[in-house]
Regions:
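Short beta-strand/loop segment that forms part of the nucleotide-sugar
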Residues: 29, 33-55, 76-80, 107
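A conserved acidic beta->alpha catalytic loop
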Residues: 24, 53-62, 82
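Nucleotide-sugar-dependent glycosyltransferase catalytic core
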Residues: 195-196, 204, 213-246, 260, ...
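Membrane-interface aromatic/basic loop that binds lipid-linked glycans or pyrophosphate carriers
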Residues: 286-356
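Cell-envelope/extracellular polymer assembly enzymes that use nucleotide-activated donors
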Residues: 2-6, 48, 202
Length: 356
């Protein structure tokens, strides 16, 4: 088996999203020996779709079992015993995967017909152990060109060295636009955090730092569906806590795997951005019932791991003067930060019709 594509699904029986995703994977150009890549290689790039239902309460699993029955040998329907969120569903897929390459997709996204052919060809011809591409951001189910997002940069590619690892720590980019050699995953015992949102904030950098050769296809081959009505776009305190936990797990993994010291400055920035700054402002914007005690917990966490994060050169460059001013105020007093932020937001809404 050349490729295993792992796709978690949860409560996807309605709206046709599951079907659109699955059909895009079933209609890949590889798997029948007739693609240009397969003819050139003299072999069939056979692939399997590991469709994992994350203990849905609707008919998602029933639909996946029907796909399995209709496409034996191509689709394998799996189900988690309890809801483990995306990381747990992916881990179940990994445990059952047989492909030389492993790819991931989110259940409400889809792939261009030649996505996996092009990624595999790039990996097979270069000897890379991870291959990525760019993506489309779309708001409807279509194969038309959307907003193109250029993901990883070409200066991150090739045989990886310390400078490239630093760039990948700073910007690993999404895992769903990549395929990974299963041998690298197995050798490094790579998995995903379970039972939480933002699992990629931990897994993404760790997986990239565990690889030795990264290549990229400079084409948007993945369609990322942005449904603003989806609950995944709503901010809750639990999601903020999950983001914080993902940051803590990233630091733990880097310590255990020997990445902490050589990439300390980059890790400090990644933690400051993902754990602290993103959480601070999304919490203040999106959570309805805010607590000073949460702001205190967030402050304790960043100061415990990286007390001098505000001196980080990447931090100084990434964030604007107002963001850094607000963070400094938070470091002085969570209460003062809260009062000032609320007053600033109210003022802007009143006089300018905006709010951070």
């Amino acid at each position: 088996m050349k490729l295993s594509i792992i796709v978690p699904f949860y409560q996807m029986a309605q709206d046709g999203k599951l079907k659109y995703c699955m059909e895009s994977l079933l209609n890949q150009t590889i798997g029948n020996g007739e693609s240009a890549a397969e003819r050139a290689a003299g072999e069939v790039y056979d692939y399997e779709i590991l469709a994992v239902d994350d203990c849905s309460k609707d008919d998602t699993y029933v639909m996946l079992k029907q796909y399995e029955a209709d496409h034996p040998g191509r689709v394998r329907a799996l189900q988690t015993p309890v809801n483990k969120r995306q990381g747990g569903a992916r881990n179940l897929g990994l445990a059952n995967a047989t492909g030389e390459w492993i790819g991931f997709m989110d259940g409400d996204d889809w792939a261009a017909p030649d996505m996996f052919e092009k990624l595999i060809v790039k990996g097979e011809t270069t000897g890379a152990d991870v291959v990525g591409c760019d993506l489309h951001q779309v708001h409807e189910h279509t194969m038309e060109i959307g907003t193109i997002v250029n993901a990883n940069t070409m200066d991150q590619t090739g045989v990886l060295d310390p400078e490239k690892y630093k760039k990948l720590m700073l910007n690993p980019c999404s895992m769903v636009i990549k395929i990974y050699r299963r041998s690298v995953i197995a050798e490094n015992k790579l998995t995903f955090p379970e039972g939480m949102f933002y699992e990629d904030n931990c897994a993404g950098p760790v997986w990239m730092l565990s690889c030795k050769h990264f290549e990229k296809v400079e084409e948007p081959l993945y369609y990322y569906y942005q449904d603003q009505s989806s609950t995944t776009h709503f901010i809750s305190e639990q999601k903020c806590l999950d983001r914080m936990r993902a940051g803590e797990l990233l630091v733990e993994q880097c310590r255990q795997r020997g990445f902490y010291e050589p990439y300390h400055t980059e890790l400090e920035f990644a933690f400051a951005k993902l754990y602290y700054m993103n959480t601070l402002f999304t919490y203040m914007i999106g959570v309805k019932r805010q607590r000073i005690s949460f702001l205190e917990e967030l402050k304790r966490g960043i100061l415990r791991e990286f007390p001098d994060f505000r001196e980080n050169p990447y931090y100084q460059k990434e964030f604007d003067a107002e963001q850094k001013k607000l963070a400094s105020l938070h470091m002085k007093s969570s209460l003062l930060f809260y009062v000032y932020y609320k007053a600033l937001t109210a003022y802007r809404r009143l006089f300018h019709g905006q709010g951070r």
